[in-house]
From Swiss-Prot:
The gene is rnc. Homodimer. Belongs to the ribonuclease III family. Digests double-stranded RNA. Involved in the processing of primary rRNA transcript to yield the immediate precursors to the large and small rRNAs (23S and 16S). Processes some mRNAs, and tRNAs when they are encoded in the rRNA operon. Processes pre-crRNA and tracrRNA of type II CRISPR loci if present in the organism. GO terms for cellular component: cytoplasm. Keywords: Cytoplasm, Endonuclease, Hydrolase, Magnesium, Metal-binding, mRNA processing, Nuclease, RNA-binding, rRNA processing, rRNA-binding, tRNA processing. Residues 153-223 form the DRBM domain. It catalyses: Endonucleolytic cleavage to 5'-phosphomonoester. One of its GO terms (biological process) is rRNA processing. The active site is at D44, E114. It holds the Pfam family Ribonucleas_3_3. Residues 5-125 form the RNase III domain. It comes from Francisella philomiragia subsp. philomiragia (strain ATCC 25017 / CCUG 19701 / FSC 153 / O#319-036). This is Ribonuclease 3. GO terms for molecular function: double-stranded RNA binding; metal ion binding; ribonuclease III activity; rRNA binding.
Length: 230
């Protein structure tokens, strides 16, 4: 029997012509090889571009650095997870037995949100998915407090410190992934070849582990007298 998705279509503001794309966007890898991972990859790129364009047009007087900070805030995990919960995507996510209980996990919600975007694009066209994304983000952008968007994330801050001092960017690599799918712990190594500095950090996602590793490297650079130039 075909699942009843009319309620979800109404929430999303989009009705799929090929509902199997939606099913795949909602399916975690623990369930089947035909899962949302490729759609997530596509949706992530589309979302980043659309939000960048919206911010460019909406805030013509903001500098590139500020625009980047705002975009980072709008496309990061917690924002996407909250939007996914608002859309009640957690009620539709398809998980395998090993992932049961993971419907409200931030990483899964974030991935499904991006996969939905990829699925809408393949089901329609770029103009359509852009319109859908803009409608989703209107209330978010309209309530933005630009003064609250001040702090760079650690990776961005580290990048600026290194570039300002004529040094190459660090290399990030995953060393280990431990635990079950819904309780994974990533160990990431950050390496600065120019300075011969190597640090490691753990996190519940690759992104979080990389941010922690970047923060560790910033602390080492600070001890060596390398700081971000204002």
């Amino acid at each position: 029997m075909v699942p009843e998705y009319s309620r979800l279509y109404k929430i999303l503001g989009y009705s799929f012509k090929n509902y199997t794309l939606l099913v795949r966007a909602l399916t975690h890898r623990s369930k089947t090889k035909k899962n949302y991972e490729r759609l997530e990859f596509l949706g992530d790129s589309i979302l980043g571009f659309v939000i960048a364009e919206v911010l460019y047009m909406e805030f013509p007087d903001l500098a590139e650095g500020k625009l980047s900070q705002i975009r980072s805030k709008l496309v990061k995990g917690v924002t996407l997870a909250n939007l996914a919960l608002n859309f009640k995507l957690d009620e539709y996510i398809i998980l395998g037995a090993s992932e049961q209980g993971g419907h409200k996990r931030e990483k899964i919600l974030e991935d499904v949100f991006e996969a939905i975007i990829g699925a809408i694009y393949l089901d329609s066209d770029f103009a359509t998915v852009k319109k859908v994304i803009v409608n989703w983000y209107k209330p978010v952008i309209s309530t933005l407090n630009l003064d609250d968007v001040k702090v760079k994330d650690s990776k961005s801050k580290l990048q600026e410190i290194l570039l300002q001092n004529g040094l190459s960017l660090p290399e990030y690599s995953i060393e280990t992934i431990d635990g079950k799918d819904h309780e994974q712990e990533f160990t990431v190594k950050a390496l600065s070849n120019d300075l011969n500095i190597e640090v490691r950090a753990k996190g519940t996602s690759r992104k979080k582990a990389e941010q922690k590793a970047a923060e560790k490297m910033i602390q080492i650079l600070s001890q060596q007298g390398l700081h971000e130039k204002k």
